[in-house]
């Protein structure tokens, strides 16, 4: 069993090909790691969210960590960790473009006929919740793998 490093091409491929990653954020003594749907364009990671702990923490401390992996079995996996800055996207046209790209990327993998909202989420009470679109501007990334 030996842990090895992914090269730059392998890191880029894993980031581009996965659908779900995990964001790690920290503020006010709280560390929070949560899975998110995302797209990666070679420079930035783009995500969407409703208001909540993750957004609150990232607004207070924009330094975040992002992790994505592909696990085939216990000794056959690869993982990338990226560090970067949370930036909220506020321009309506850019928000719409990013949301459309997220929908185009995720919809082929959704089993039922539901369509993700384009301007907001609907909560359990049926109220519309503001949709927050953001990016992580990557400053550093590393990758590891194990294959037996």
Segment roles from a protein language model:
Residues 54-61, 65-83, 87:
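Helix-adjacent hinge/juxtasegments
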Residues 27, 70, 137-140:
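Short, structured patches in soluble enzyme cores that scaffold and shape functional sites
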Residues 12, 37, 56, 72, ...:
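Short secondary-structure boundary/capping segments
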Residues 78-148:
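Charged, gly/pro-rich active-site loop segments
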């Amino acid at each position: 069993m030996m842990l090895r490093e992914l090269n730059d091409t392998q890191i880029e491929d894993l980031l581009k090909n996965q659908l779900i990653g995990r964001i790690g954020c920290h503020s006010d003594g709280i560390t929070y790691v949560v899975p998110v749907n995302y797209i990666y364009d070679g420079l930035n990671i783009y995500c969407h969210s409703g208001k909540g702990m993750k957004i609150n923490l990232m607004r207070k401390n924009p330094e975040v960590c992002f992790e994505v992996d592909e696990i085939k079995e216990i000794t056959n996996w690869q993982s990338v960790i990226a560090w970067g800055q949370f930036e909220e996207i506020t321009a309506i046209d850019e928000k719409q473009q990013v949301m459309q790209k997220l929908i185009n990327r995720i919809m082929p993998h959704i089993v039922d006929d539901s369509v993700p909202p384009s301007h907001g989420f609907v909560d359990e009470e049926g109220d519309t919740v503001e949709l927050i679109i953001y990016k992580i501007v990557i400053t550093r990334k590393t990758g590891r793998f194990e294959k037996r």
